[in-house]
């Protein structure tokens, strides 16, 4: 499907969970001849990341309202109006055929600006429960899509766009068949790390002994303290790294993952075909719990809420998963994934531009 001469503006910012799926769709459409620009904020990750992908970015001034004081709330309408006016001027100059909202504060004024100019608005909700901005924008959007069922009652479930190197991994049957020895446990805390996992997993390693080998991604600034915790638990042999640059290689190595359940993490684990033990971040709307629930229902994962988390709970769960069970769970995870999510979102963008 050629997009020669078509123009897209992607609105996404703040976190990797919004930005990386947007980049996947952008690259897919650029390969079809689309021109793509980005709308973001200058003080968040998209400011550095998006230009590295060869995409020009425009900035508006906007920030979130949650947890702000009364003065900020009083000033909010004026701030939103100014951000809308900035976005509108940018879009009048660029003249996109369609805008794609992938979440983050920038999507609110950006989506309203597009709507006020008669530009189709396509939305994608990455999480199992809709964010405030997308709830508002859904009322004016041309098309609303969701990664997991339940965020919107009638929106099409299309999955989350994930990186091509993860999608290219061999299927679980090919990858895991014939593996022997200690079960390979990948612990992923995200770029900031997950303190609860950093504190719990060294004790889990002590309980499980030689039955597991662990690769623990600790997050920025935590590698030394986590290595020390493993050593103090009598388990210095396990590998601890601050970051993992090649997640596809880490997934290929692992037999099972212990991690938070951010939207992109859940989608990548399903696409990779891996069993998981999810410990959702305690957010008031339980966003990460709802992200993980479809894989638990599919028999591909187990959720332990943070309030129920203990060394015994994690150790007993991992000890109860034989290699046969892990392979079955891995196959169920892969079966629950939507590997063509990027194409599905891109196709809806193309349809909206032609409508």
Curated annotation (Swiss-Prot):
GO terms for biological process: carbohydrate metabolic process; cell division; cell wall organization; lipid glycosylation; peptidoglycan biosynthetic process; regulation of cell shape. Keywords: Cell cycle, Cell division, Cell inner membrane, Cell membrane, Cell shape, Cell wall biogenesis/degradation, Glycosyltransferase, Membrane, Peptidoglycan synthesis, Transferase. One of its GO terms (molecular function) is UDP-N-acetyl-D-glucosamine:N-acetylmuramoyl-L-alanyl-D-glutamyl-meso-2,6-diaminopimelyl-D-alanyl-D-alanine-diphosphoundecaprenol 4-beta-N-acetylglucosaminlytransferase activity. Signal peptide: none annotated. CDD domains: GT28_MurG (cd03785). It is a peripheral membrane protein. Pathway: Cell wall biogenesis; peptidoglycan biosynthesis. UDP-N-acetyl-alpha-D-glucosamine binds at residues 15-17, 127, 163, 191, 244, 263-268, 288. GO terms for cellular component: plasma membrane. InterPro entries: GlcNAc_MurG, Glyco_trans_28_C, GlycoTrans_28_N. It is an enzyme of class 2 (transferase). It is found in: Cell inner membrane. Cell wall formation. Catalyzes the transfer of a GlcNAc subunit on undecaprenyl-pyrophosphoryl-MurNAc-pentapeptide (lipid intermediate I) to form undecaprenyl-pyrophosphoryl-MurNAc-(pentapeptide)GlcNAc (lipid intermediate II). Belongs to the glycosyltransferase 28 family. MurG subfamily. NCBIfam families: murG. This is UDP-N-acetylglucosamine--N-acetylmuramyl-(pentapeptide) pyrophosphoryl-undecaprenol N-acetylglucosamine transferase. It comes from Escherichia coli O1:K1 / APEC.
């Amino acid at each position: 499907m050629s997009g020669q001469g078509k123009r897209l503006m992607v609105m996404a910012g703040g976190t990797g969970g919004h930005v990386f799926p947007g980049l996947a769709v952008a690259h897919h459409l650029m390969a079809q001849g689309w021109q793509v620009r980005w709308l973001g904020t200058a003080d968040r990750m998209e400011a550095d990341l998006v230009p590295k992908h060869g995409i020009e970015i425009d900035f508006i001034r906007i920030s979130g309202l949650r947890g702000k004081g009364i003065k900020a709330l009083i000033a909010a309408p004026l701030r939103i109006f100014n951000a809308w006016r900035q976005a509108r001027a940018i879009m009048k100059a660029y003249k996109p055929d369609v805008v794609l909202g992938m979440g983050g504060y920038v999507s609110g004024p950006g989506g309203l600006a597009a709507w006020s100019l008669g530009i189709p608005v396509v939305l994608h909700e990455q999480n199992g429960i809709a964010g405030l901005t997308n709830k508002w924008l859904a009322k004016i959007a041309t098309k609303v899509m969701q990664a997991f069922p339940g965020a919107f009652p009638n929106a099409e479930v299309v999955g989350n766009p994930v990186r091509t190197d993860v999608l290219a991994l061999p299927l679980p049957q090919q990858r895991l068949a014939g593996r022997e020895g200690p079960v390979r446990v990948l612990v992923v805390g995200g770029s900031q790390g997950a303190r609860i996992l950093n504190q719990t997993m060294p004790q889990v390693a002590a309980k499980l002994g030689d039955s597991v080998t662990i690769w623990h991604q600790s997050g920025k600034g935590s590698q030394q303290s986590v290595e020390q915790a493993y050593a103090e638990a009598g388990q210095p042999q396990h590998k601890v790294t601050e970051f993992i640059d090649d997640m596809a290689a880490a997934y290929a190595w692992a037999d099972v993952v212990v991690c938070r359940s951010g939207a992109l993490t859940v989608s990548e684990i399903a696409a990779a075909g891996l069993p998981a033990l999810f410990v959702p971040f305690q957010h008031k709307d339980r966003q990460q719990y709802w992200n993980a629930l479809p894989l638990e229902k599919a028999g591909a994962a187990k959720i332990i809420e943070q309030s129920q988390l203990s060394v015994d709970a994690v150790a007993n769960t991992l000890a109860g998963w034989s290699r046969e069970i892990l392979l079955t769970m891995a196959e169920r995870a892969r079966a629950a994934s939507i590997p063509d999510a990027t194409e599905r979102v891109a196709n809806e963008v193309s349809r909206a531009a032609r409508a």
